[in-house]
Swiss-Prot record:
GO cellular component annotations of the record: cytoplasm
Descriptive protein name: Glutathione synthetase
The UniProt record lists the keyword Metal-binding: yes
Entry similarity comment: Belongs to the prokaryotic GSH synthase family.
InterPro entries: ATP-grasp, ATP_grasp_subdomain_1, Glut_synth_pro, GSHS_ATP-bd, GSHS_N, PreATP-grasp_dom_sf
């Protein structure tokens, strides 16, 4: 079964192929004989109820410096595609949200992965609060008095943008830190939205585990260890990836959230776990597929396309 697959992503020229999940998914789709097309979100249009994009046929190669070839741009009705991958990186802003509204017009006749309506309605740092008993103590607010009371209760805290990504804008504040008021003032100037405050988890020094789920089932994980003088474990900001296995607690977390992921049409999801606590459910453009395979884990790209092909039969 040959599928026509359009990948909505940041431009293919910008990806780092060693760690890019969109690239890994494209490689596997091509290996299976599917026809790949590429476009960036700014080439997506809605006219008279139809969804169009200026797409280019794409070929990919696992060769640094020569990893892609693109054909001519052709204005195409995306309802002619079998699958559209919603894979541009956050931030989860109005530009991102608008693409989900547009792509919702063709789903599920054209299978959009992940389901655009549920992506829009499941912001990663808010969706996770549906499982409050699996999380560290968490506050979402813009009220400085609430933040001050939260810090008084828990001492060390983490403050971060509600719709940030890649470790940007994350601050670790100690109980006696005098910068809280200044930080909240800065956040108020930079962000219109509330921000998220969480109890600091000392286990982050041992790593922040990214667990990947396909159709609600855990299929692989990596442990991301922060640099010596940083509280952030994201690989974008210097975190180090390590081989890991799932603990009994992590399997319990996955079993709890799996049914909800399947109900929402989330085929590919990445959750973040520190110690015994889940901190995020990533549904927009989860990463980690290549790192898991590099450490001898499952071929998650293959499992992903098994799931997608199963839904197109």
């Amino acid at each position: 079964m040959k599928l026509k697959i359009a990948v909505q992503m940041d431009h293919i020229s910008t990806v780092s192929i060693a760690g890019d999940t969109s690239f890994a998914l494209s490689l596997e789709a091509q290996r299976r004989g599917h026809q790949l097309f590429h476009y960036t979100p700014d080439r997506l249009s809605l006219r008279d109820g139809k969804v169009f994009a200026r797409i280019e046929e794409m070929q990919v190669r696992d060769e640094k410096g020569s990893h892609y070839s693109l054909g001519e741009k052709v204005r195409t009705d995306l309802s002619e595609m079998d699958v559209v991958l919603l894979r541009q990186d956050p931030p989860f802003d109005m530009n991102y949200i608008t693409t989900t509204h547009i792509l919702e017009r063709i789903h599920p006749k054209t299978l959009v992965v992940n389901d655009p309506a549920w992506v829009r309605n499941s912001p990663e740092k808010i969706f996770v609060t549906e499982f409050a008993d699996l999380m560290p103590d968490t506050l979402i607010t813009k009220d400085p008095l609430e933040v001050a009371a939260f810090r008084k209760e828990f001492g060390d805290i983490i403050v971060k943008p509600l719709y940030g990504n890649g470790g940007a804008g994350i601050f670790h504040l100690h109980e006696a830190d005098r910068n809280l008021a200044s930080l909240l003032e800065m956040f108020g100037q930079l962000f219109r939205e509330p921000y998220i405050v969480q109890r600091y988890l000392k286990d982050v020094r041992k790593g922040d585990k990214r667990i990947i789920l396909i159709d609600g089932e855990p299929v692989g994980a990596i442990n991301r260890v922060p640099a010596e003088h940083d509280s952030r474990s994201n690989m974008h900001v210097g975190g180090r990836a390590e081989k890991t296995e799932l603990t009994e607690r992590e399997r319990e977390i996955c079993a709890r959230i799996g049914p909800s992921l399947r109900e929402r049409g989330f085929i590919l999801v990445g959750i973040d776990v520190i110690g015994d606590y889940m901190t995020e459910i990533n549904v927009t453009s989860p990463t980690g597929v290549r790192e898991v395979q590099r450490f001898g884990g499952a071929d998650i790209a293959s499992l992903f396309w098994d799931a997608v092909e199963g839904k197109r039969k």
